[in-house]
Every structure is written in C-alpha cells, then in structure tokens.
C-alpha cells in the first residue's frame, strides 16, 4: 500500500544548471545567478539556532571545513549519537558543533503521512511508546519521550525536550540554517507498511523544497538517498542521478546486526532474517554500476576488501558505516574510502587529521 501524498514535482530533463566550487566527488555547488540557482544564506529567524552557545561554538558552526577535499568526508550517523539520543535535535546540533561534514538519518512514515526520523519500525527501544511508527500520527509521536533512555542531560542550546523528535522537514530547516556546506544522507527503512510510498514521500518532500536530483544540491545541503532494499534504491533511480543514490550492503550475521543496529539478540535474529532476503541482490546493484555510491558496513569492508577495492576502481564512491574506532578508521584510510559514517564524528575527524599530518597517536596499539 502506497502512502497518500501530493503529486511529485517533475523536473524537466536535460536542464543543466551552472555549478562552481569544490565538493569532493562532484562538480561543485550551485551559486547565485541564472535560472534555478540558489543563494546560500544563514539562519534569518530571530530565534538563535543554538540557544546558549558561546561565540567560539558559533564560529565553529559557521566555518566551512576547508580541507575536506584532502580527506574523507565524515558523516554523523544518526547525528552525534554516541553523545546524545540518536536521530534527535540534540544529536544533530552536536554533530554540527563537532564539525561533521554531513549527517545521516533514517526515515519512517507516520499514519498521517509525515516523514519522521526514527530507525526502528517499532517504537520502544528509544522511546516510551509501543507499536509501529506507521500506526501513529505525528501528534501522537510528539507526546512521547525520545530522550530519557539515553540518560544524558540535554543542554538548552541543543533544543527543548518537546523539540527532540524531528521530521525530515525540520532536519532540513536545521541544516539550512547553518552557515556552511553540509551533506545529508537519507535512508529509507524497510520493510515499510507503505512500500515504495516511503521513497515517493522522500522525493516529494525534497523536490517541494527545491532539491535538484541531478546535482544533489538543496541550497547549502548536498543530499543523497539510500537504502538496503534494492527495490527502494531502484525506485530512487527512476528520478535521481546515480551519483546521489547509495546501495547499502552488509554481511548478515547476528553479531554484525547487533553491533551495527545496536539491538538485542532477539531483535538481531529478526533483523537478520529480513536482511538476508535483501542483501544478496543488493551487491550486483553496485558491481553493475547502477549506483555510484556504495555503502558497505565496516565488517563487510574487513571481510571483502578485494570487492570494495574493485568497486572503488570502477568509480564508486565508498560510504562506509559505522566507523567508531581508530582501527576501523585506519582501515578506511588504507582503502581510500571517500566517506566515513560514525557515531563519534569529532573523534574520527581527529584521527583522520592526525593520520594526514603523520602525527603518532596512542591509539595505534589497537592495531595489534
């Protein structure tokens, strides 16, 4: 069953907008001037983006990552989710403060057709709710507590309690208000009660806001879409350039599912059963060149380095997840991975900077 929604805005084919300026792995960013161009602006609301932040923090937010072209881009997995509750406003504000080049999010559709940031199909792991997300309205979800499970205080600068659950629209508002270029990787979660209506809802929202699926740019945000589900990926490919579509892949052992999805053993068994139906046909989508973004998990990279190197040699951009240790960061650097997704972006940025500068680090003992 497909989710009801407005007719997707159809972008005329063959229209190429002028681009200039560097972004790793692409031709550049849209500038002002000419039809369809956009001007990058900072937040214009009288309400400060980050309440209570000091001037140095604000400077860090507004300063572009000038040397990003010299290193992998670092994406914050569900925001800075080691520090704050995953997929909440606080996690994304912290990711911005940490200097992440981009952020990653998972989306689910509510009963009344809103795209909310939530990883699991069921409520409960990260909230005091129960039942499927798809059977709740946005208003019902707003009434739930999505932060207490993490047991960390939320600074005033990171949003009020009732602001923590985000829709995709609200995340885009947050990212657009930041005075620098940011990447956004949007993952659709399956199985979904709405089928490919989930992908359609993502496309409708992005195009309504002015996203260009050829260049990937939406103002200051470089947007890409991704899924483990091959049908979801191929649905995106009907409208989006392969440069901005990522096929996610992973070996589906119970251990790797538990680690990557941060769930208990019983849930891992259920997730693994579903993923085994999806992953085998997913790999050829990368090897056949249907997409240009390859999204293997770090354990897949360790277990299949020849495959990963072959993808890179064939022109794929590697987006590896979830990289939270110095050892895994080193593996990515040694293989020439272009994008790293992590729960600890500040730490990974530091490790990458040290590696680029040839600075010895105490973490090298982890290679044993």
Task: Explain the meaning of each model-derived region.
Residues 2-368:
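Phosphate-group recognition and catalysis centered on beta-loop-alpha active-site segments
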């Amino acid at each position: 069953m497909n989710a009801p929604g407005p007719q997707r805005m159809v972008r005329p084919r063959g229209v190429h907008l002028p681009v200039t300026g560097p972004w790793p792995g692409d031709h550049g960013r849209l500038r002002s001037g000419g039809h369809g161009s956009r001007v990058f602006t900072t937040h214009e609301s009288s309400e400060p983006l980050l309440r209570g932040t000091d001037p140095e923090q604000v400077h860090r937010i507004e300063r572009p990552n000038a040397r990003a072209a010299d290193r992998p881009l670092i994406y914050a997995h569900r925001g800075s989710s080691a520090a704050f509750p995953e997929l909440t406003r606080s996690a994304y504000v912290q990711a911005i403060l940490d200097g992440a080049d981009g952020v990653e999010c998972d989306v689910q559709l509510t009963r009344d057709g809103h795209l909310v940031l939530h990883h699991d199909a069921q409520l409960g792991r990260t909230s005091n709710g129960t039942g499927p997300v798809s059977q709740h309205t946005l208003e019902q979800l707003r009434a739930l507590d999505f932060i207490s499970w993490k047991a960390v205080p939320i600074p005033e600068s990171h949003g009020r309690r009732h602001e923590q659950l985000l829709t995709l629209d609200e995340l885009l508002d947050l990212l657009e208000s930041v005075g620098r270029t940011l990447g956004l990787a949007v993952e659709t979660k399956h199985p979904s009660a709405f089928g490919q209506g989930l992908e359609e809802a993502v496309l409708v929202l992005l195009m309504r806001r002015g996203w260009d699926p050829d260049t990937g740019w939406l103002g200051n945000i470089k947007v890409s879409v991704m899924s483990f589900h091959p049908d979801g990926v191929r649905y995106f490919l009907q409208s989006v350039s392969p440069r901005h579509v990522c096929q996610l892949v992973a070996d589906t052992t119970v251990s790797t599912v538990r680690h990557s999805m941060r769930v208990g053993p019983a849930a891992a068994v259920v997730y693994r059963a579903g993923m085994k139906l999806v992953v085998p046909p997913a790999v050829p989508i990368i090897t056949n060149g249907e997409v240009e973004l390859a999204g293997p998990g770090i354990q897949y990279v360790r277990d299949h380095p020849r495959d990963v190197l072959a993808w890179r040699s064939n022109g794929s951009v590697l987006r590896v997840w979830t990289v939270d240790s110095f050892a895994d960061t080193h593996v990515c650097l040694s293989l020439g991975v272009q994008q790293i997704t992590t729960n600890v972006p500040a730490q990974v940025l530091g490790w990458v900077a040290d590696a680029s500068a040839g600075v010895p680090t105490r973490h090298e003992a982890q290679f044993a």
